[in-house]
Amino acid sequence: MRTTTCFLSNIHQYLSIKRLIPNAREMLLSPPSSSLFEQYYSKINLFANNDIEINNNEWEKAVEVLRTPLPVSFRWNSAIDFQDKVGNQKHQGKRQLLENNISYKQLQFVDAWELNVDARALQNDIDKKKAFRWIVAQTRSGVISRQEVASMIPVSLLNIEKNHRVLDLCASPGSKTRQALEKLCNTIAIKSDDLGIVVANDVNLKRSFIIANRCNVLGLHTQRLCVTNHKAQSFPNISIKASTNKNEGAAIVDGQYDRIVCDVPCSGDGTLRKDPIIWQRWHPEFSQKLHPLRKFPILFSPEIN
């Protein structure tokens, strides 16, 4: 039933795209062509260099990267309770990838793999079906988390410790939230009395549910997760207990977060690598309309730190 539902959903999505863009199928199978996106960015001196030739060369390199399909990447679960499963599946994963003629690169700053294949090829190539099914199975079990490499960087740099209070202000779809929660729980047992917590916020209620669902695979570790539904610009400065130690009293501190993640809404230009149809639909207003939404959460975040 699930397979049938997914199949029908994909057909519906394709037909919807087909109605909007007559050559949708051809666009999916061929490299993107010149577009308003390229015209706009090539004229605004994006690289701020007085040498026109250098600017043109840099722009050509940027477009070349954007036209390159985004490699599949995933992060290994770092929560302490998953370490045995992770160790076992790393051996299984290496074997599955080798059998399907797929190579991988171990990232240096986080325990994650980047494959030499993009998502569309991985899913549609018959010779890679076993590797695809293995990735799906390990994602559902919580052993790995599908996440773009760029998305892994912020939390990796925060040096989150077991007693930290972390706020993810614009959290949906929850990949960074889950990464932060795993970092919080990678050196302590589930029943520890430490007060570390991740507060994940999103303005959209449905997206807040997505965050909770994404972290659900972590089981009891989610007792350290609080999902909220507020505007980032006016997130309440909540009070948190400073300690549960009776000898230290019951001091209360206001909004004293040790780490804040603020991944504000973006133009989505990078998704060109995943969805070539965007090349034809892109418009400068997409980014311009988001400017106020990006500005205010960044200005507001220090006030609740």
Identify the residue ranges that each predicted region occupies.
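S-adenosylmethionine
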Residues: 1-305
